[in-house]
Amino acid sequence: MDEFQRYGNKHKSWQQCFLYPLFFREDLYTIAHDLYLDKSSSSEPTELSISNFFSFPTVKRLIRRIRQQNDSNSIGLFRNCDPNRFINRNRNSYSELVLEGLTVILEVSLAMQSKHFIEGMDGWKSIRSIHCIFTLMEDKFPYSNYVSDIRVPYSIHPEILVRTFRRWIRDAPSLHLLRSILHEWRNSFSAENLQKALVPPRENRRFSLFLWNSYVYECESFLVSLLKQFYHSRSLLYGSFPDRTHFDKKIKHIVIFPVKISTKRIWLLKYPFIYYVRYGERSLIALKGTHLQVKRCRYHLFNFWQYYFHLWSQPYRVCILELSKIYFYFLGHFLSFKMKTLVVRTKMLDDLLISDIIANEFNPIAPIRSILLYLTKERFCDISGQPISRLSWTNLSDDDILDRFDRMCRNIFHYYSGSINKDGLYYIKYILLLPCAKTLACKHKSTIRVVREESGSELFTKSFSKEREFIYSSFSKTCSQRERNWNSDIIQINILVNYWQKIHNKQIEK
């Protein structure tokens, strides 16, 4: 794949965004063929591989048929394939292979376009670690007073995606081919799932992820430039007030000031700090400004989606939250900002100045109740939180049982290492360790006391890695309850977060 992308940097068709000639290159479908076999089921016999009867002229004829098809004569790119497609040489296998080839070309082309976009944006950083988002929020968000919680719209008409592709694909044949594929993609969904037309189905996840990434890239290429213009339209008078960040809050909390003093003039001098983070479909825009400025920003977002993408976003997809008064949910954490008073002592020659600074403190909280619901669903405990044994694991070896509980414990503690409610995580640790002992006791037909006496201190440590000991040490009771440890190696969202996110989205949409 990397060689194919390096080849694209030299080829004129890539540089000029004329992609249609590349659809008929045989080496492209060699790559697509390998990707197709990688995602095929391992239970399929290897001697019935598609490579035994793959014909490149058949691929060419199929591409021409896709371009010439109408609604009454559908090729069936997105229909469920016959399980015996290798034996029957079903045409759907060729359709999926063509779809893989088209996706490879479009992915490489989009990667080249997005690389130029990111290089051209000053200050734009794309990071892989999820916890890097929390470190940014810890550093920057306390200086904001509003946050817009945005869910990117999902329901997208095929013609909107075609318009998106027209900005970086210049040849008409490629656009006609993509239009035919996208309309068939939309028609493959049922009426009740039409509003989630970009949710990846299991059969064509690669193509669906490409559509999602290209759509988000197009949104951000416009949105970031608008935010930067909005940021540069600030008032320059703010620079002459170095203590302006905390000045308003001091006025609110010092009662000796007369009531007639109004803070409206101070608000007019302030300009909005704007910070934008996104993971998946959830985006956060933190602003420091007046409520009117924040509402104006939301108004521009609605106009942005309607003007560029002809989308009417539901009101629940853009929420304005005041940081000092509410909790909000993001990436599996409940986030809040509580007001905190800091005493600063400054010594200047013979004088000692003492100043009180009122600042917002970032407080990420692990959703203990949702973790308990997930553990109840997976039968680690009952509804009341009492641990129970995993009878289905009694046929495993002792090391395998310890490894499974260790993996579950490590995933939870590693992901929520930055939360402040460590007492709740101690209880989660207890719930996971006790079922481990109960499962071993059921396997050996004994009691928990007998298992602990026979294994001693090695019961929960003989198969645990040093990484686990490091994680548990950060959650030891000798550690400060306010201390946070963010892990920069987490590049994938936790399965608990996905489970809780679905419940949270359903509650919002009601």
Swiss-Prot record:
Primary subcellular site in the record, as a coarse category: plastid
GO aspect biological process, one term: RNA splicing
Compartments reported by the entry: Plastid, Chloroplast
GO molecular function: RNA binding
InterPro entries: Domain_X (IPR024937), Maturase_MatK (IPR002866), Maturase_MatK_N (IPR024942)
GO cellular component, one term: chloroplast
Keywords assigned: Chloroplast, mRNA processing, Plastid, RNA-binding, tRNA processing
Pfam family, one: MatK_N
Signal peptide stretch: none
Statement: the UniProt record of this protein carries the keyword Transmembrane: no
Family indicated by similarity: Belongs to the intron maturase 2 family. MatK subfamily.
Known function: Usually encoded in the trnK tRNA gene intron. Probably assists in splicing its own and other chloroplast group II introns.
Protein name: Maturase K
Native species: Taxus cuspidata
Lineage of origin: Eukaryota, Viridiplantae, Streptophyta, Embryophyta, Tracheophyta
